[in-house]
Curated annotation (Swiss-Prot):
UniProt family annotation: Belongs to the AB hydrolase superfamily. Lipase family.
Function: Has dual calcium-independent phospholipase and O-acyltransferase activities with a potential role in glycerophospholipid homeostasis and remodeling of acyl groups of lipophilic alcohols present in acidic cellular compartments. Catalyzes hydrolysis of the ester bond of the fatty acyl group attached at sn-1 or sn-2 position of phospholipids (phospholipase A1 or A2 activity) and transfer it to the hydroxyl group at the first carbon of lipophilic alcohols (O-acyltransferase activity).
Source species of the chain: Homo sapiens
Binding site for substrate: 46, 199
EC assignment: 2.3.1.-, 3.1.1.32, 3.1.1.4, 3.1.1.5
Impact noted for substituting residue 198 to A: Abolishes phospholipase and transacylase activity. Abolishes association with membranes
Protein name from the UniProt record: Lysosomal phospholipase A and acyltransferase
Record's subcellular location: Lysosome; Secreted; Membrane
Catalytic site: 198, 360, 392
Keywords: Acyltransferase, Disulfide bond, Fatty acid metabolism, Glycoprotein, Hydrolase, Lipid degradation, Lipid metabolism, Lysosome, Membrane, Metal-binding, Secreted, Signal, Transferase, Zinc
Disulphide bond pairs: 65-89
Glycosylated residues, chain numbering: 99, 273, 289, 398
pH dependence: Optimum pH is 4-4.5.
Length: 412
């Protein structure tokens, strides 16, 4: 509650006390009432929140596949759907279909996919609703926030989205995100801290670059970036060429490749020329080398020409030279062998030999450090924090990460 002094009572206060009260009112931070912590919005990365699907399909790829369901079911993450044979059903349902005419994606016939839990944290705390440790994602961080006095679904909320798509196809999501931020500002008396991981940072940057500076100054207190692929990631070329099963032995890389290629967000995360040298060879074969200037031929040679169109659709979505326009805390992992380039004896349908560089195991250090360029391009602070030995996913539960986040939210 605010301090209300009735006019006829003011004269009864001693001069010293009146001066003290006025001084305290002037010095109070108008952005956040005393004793309150800033509300938090969590933005997950690629594969970083649950998806649900409902089926009414004209045909199926295998007699074991469900053709029709009465209600929505979890399509990501449900480990049972990734078993041999059943995974064919899963891929046919979760893939996107690219329309060359409209330059947009759509769901397969008879499949409807939705994102559960916008404004809640459950769909990004655990990717698997059974809450198995395999699917644990933001859980440790949210538990820490609760321990610091936050409440799930109130002053800490999740902003899940359809991570298969790039931002240009998720317009309603950004409208909902803006509305939620404004609502939290009103409910909790101050600007919001955005905490994003991996590709969620690119989504957040896309969002912030499209908001007026006055809006950002009012509603955003800080942006905490974890493992951001600002300049794209080298491993994307391997994902597109031969697939990547993320070391899950029951999933064949070529099997999962179809789904990975159909997600426009995959091509969006290819390395960018504002971070990488145009001379750098990312993929080497016995007959040809591919740099970032060779993407069109790369897509032709892997038999996925729609990928070149997807890249053209998404390459300019984020303006590299345009800073977010808010206080930025850029946390990045180092010291973990990270795929840097690939050599294929047989291209593209066999696993390559991998040359490693520095990074967090997924995001190359060169890409993560792109945020340094903004230090001279905005008035707001851009602070970098190295996380030595911190792997891309594990950094969310890293003690250093959590201690840093606590300082941002609650002070020293």
């Amino acid at each position: 509650m605010g301090l209300h002094l009735r006019p006829y009572r003011v004269g009864l206060l001693p001069d010293g006390l009146l001066f003290l009260l006025l001084l305290l009112m002037l010095l109070a931070d108008p952005a956040l009432p005393a004793g309150r912590h800033p509300p938090v919005v969590l933005v997950p990365g690629d594969l970083g929140n649950q998806l649900e699907a409902k089926l009414d399909k004209p045909t199926v790829v295998h007699y074991l596949c469900s053709k029709k369901t009465e209600s929505y079911f979890t399509i990501w993450l449900n480990l049972e759907l990734l078993l041999p044979v059943i995974i064919d059903c899963w891929i046919d349902n979760i893939r996107l279909v690219y329309n060359k005419t409209s330059r947009a994606t759509q769901f397969p016939d008879g499949v409807d996919v939705r994102v559960p839990g916008f404004g809640k944290t459950f769909s990004l705390e655990f990717l698997d609703p059974s809450k198995s440790s395999v699917g644990s994602y933001f859980h440790t961080m949210v538990e820490s926030l609760v321990g610091w006095g936050y409440t799930r679904g109130e002053d800490v909320r999740g902003a899940p989205y359809d991570w298969r798509r790039a931002p240009n196809e998720n317009g309603p999501y950004f409208l909902a995100l803006r509305e939620m931020i404004e609502e939290m500002y009103q409910l909790y008396g101050g600007p919001v801290v955005l905490v994003a991981h991996s590709m969620g940072n690119m989504y957040t940057l896309y969002f912030l670059q499209r908001q007026p500076q006055a809006w950002k100054d009012k509603y955003i207190r800080a942006f905490v970036s974890l493992g951001a692929p600002w300049g794209g990631v080298a491993k994307t070329l391997r994902v597109l060429a031969s697939g990547d099963n993320n070391r899950i032995p029951v999933i064949g890389p070529l099997k999962i490749r179809e789904q990975q290629r159909s997600a426009v967000s995959t091509s969006w995360l290819l390395p960018y020329n504002y971070t990488w040298s145009p001379e750098k060879v990312f993929v080497q074969t016995p007959t040809i080398n591919y740099t970032l200037r060779d993407y069109r031929k790369f897509f032709q040679d892997i038999g996925f020409e729609d990928g070149w169109l997807m890249r053209q659709d998404t390459e300019g979505l984020v303006e590299a030279t345009m800073p977010p326009g808010v206080q930025l805390h850029c946390l990045y992992g180092t010291g973990v062998p990270t795929p840097d380039s690939f050599y294929y004896e047989s291209f593209p349908d066999r696993d390559p030999k991998i040359c490693f560089g520095d990074g967090d195991g997924t995001v190359n250090l060169k890409s993560a450090l792109q945020c340094q360029a903004w230090q001279s391009r905005q008035e707001h602070q851009v602070l970098l924090q190295e996380l030595p030995g911190s792997e891309h996913i594990e950094m969310l539960a890293n003690a250093t990460t959590l201690a840093y986040l606590k300082r941002v939210l609650l002070g020293p």
